[in-house]
Amino acid sequence: MLDSRAARFPDRRFARFEDGTQWTYASCRDEVRRLAQGLQARRVRKGDRVFVWLPSGRPIVLAWFAINYLGAVYVPLNTAYKGKVLEHVINAAGGSVMLAHPSLTERLQGLQTPKLQQVFTDVDALLGDASALDDSTPIEHWDIQCIIYTSGTTGPSKGVLSPYLQGYTTAVVNYGYLQDGECILINLPMFHVGGTSSITCALVRSGSFYLVEGFSTTQFWNQVREGQCSTTSGLIGVMAAFLSKAEPRADDADNPLKYITMFPVNEETIAFAKRFGFDYLTGFNMTEVSTPLMTDMNAPPDGSCGWPRSGIECRLVDENDIEIPRGQIGELICRSDIPWNMNAGYDGLPEATARAWRNGWFHTGDLFRQDEQGKYYFVDRIKDTIRRRGENISSFEVENAIRQFPQVDEVVVVGVANEVAEQDVLAVIKPKAGDPFDPAKLIEFLSPLLAYFMIPRYVRLVNEIPKTETNKPRKVVFRDEGITADTWDREKAGIRLRRERL
């Protein structure tokens, strides 16, 4: 595809980087071919795994494209990796070549990584002679393009095998609104599917991208205007909330943004979209699949992830894979009518792959419900569901309510065993600096927001909530620790909640 775009639009701008470097389609193709030849001269061949451990910028995109130009497999590493996590990923993928930032290589010292043989810290020093490149090896859409590592909350990171067709499909689904020649601002990392699919979409649409090192509330709008970006790689989680805190200005809507994919969409994010004058949509995605659920543009804030996109079939099932009636809660499973546009399994983990793909459907591990119109609503991760006195409780919903309490900075909610073999709700809270935190006031605040059985019995205050390498809270830590000596007990404090009698 890069060759095609370089032939059709050689002088069209394709890339802009934060350091001021730019590529046209032709200059990008020329550099990619030179690096591909340099890697080929160092015995990188089709199917080889090549680690790329670099921050966002020209070198990582150049490395990614050159690796794939040879048909080799791009294996990006999170720049936060260190210690045993880093050792596990390197050994699991089994690559022998790494392109790394020089400041990161000291983390390799002391690790047992016997298969890793060559580590290069200067991408430009590897540029070779493009005329000597052997590019005769065909690349098929079912070949593995990359291995993206996803952090689990209960076990080691798993490498998701992503074929070329999955990368293409994810790009055109997530950013299908991008028009020919438009620019996309990318502030997600290149070890994240949101980052790679954004660049792929720019290539598919003959557009351009502006890659910055990360999301910045203070620089976001300057970057949008500098790059004349009509969209971004997405506003995920609290990004929109952070941007909304800026003082309103008369020219807020005077910006080039036209449309954004946001996760989630609610009243606050819609107000944000209206304030800054862009259209929005949302959906559901994970590294393993190619955005199976999408809403219409400017859908109402009903909490829905939309409907299955064209070419995707979805079901909600029980623990035996039996489809459940609408309105009930079940696991989302999905499959495609075209092979290879979802993951090809977990690298080196045949049992995990078989579990995820059992009965010919990919099991997301997420609980959803479906309304009478066929729209899907996210409820919780299966392992994050709490069972209390016959009721299934969504930790996601309880966390959202607790976040509204003014003194809460971060929160995770887990189930802990109780005396009757089910669970009680534990809220682990990192409070904001300031006044002392009173758990009783939190319970009073939550009473009108949540069903009585959803309100936490236990509240524990912590200084930090541990995260995975991809910044997800490690809930398993608090499940394993259970009720600690510093945990506040609502019932011991004399606060008992009862079901309202009608």
Can you say where each PLM-predicted feature lies in the sequence?
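Gly/Ser/Thr-rich phosphate-binding loop
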Residues: 204, 226-235, 244-302, 313, ...
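Conserved pre-ATP/AMP-binding loop-to-beta segment of ANL
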Residues: 10-11, 131-149, 156, 177-183
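AMP-binding/adenylate-forming catalytic core of the ANL superfamily
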Residues: 81, 98, 314, 334-338, ...
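Conserved AMP-binding/adenylation subdomain of ANL enzymes
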Residues: 168-183, 191-231, 245
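Short beta-strand->loop structural element characteristic of the AMP-binding/adenylate-forming
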Residues: 51-53, 60, 64, 68-99, ...
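Conserved AMP-binding A3 loop
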Residues: 24-26, 145-169
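Conserved AMP-binding/adenylate-forming core of the ANL superfamily
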Residues: 11-57, 61-65, 82-87, 165
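Structural core segment of the AMP-binding/adenylate-forming
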Residues: 37, 41-42, 65, 69-128, ...
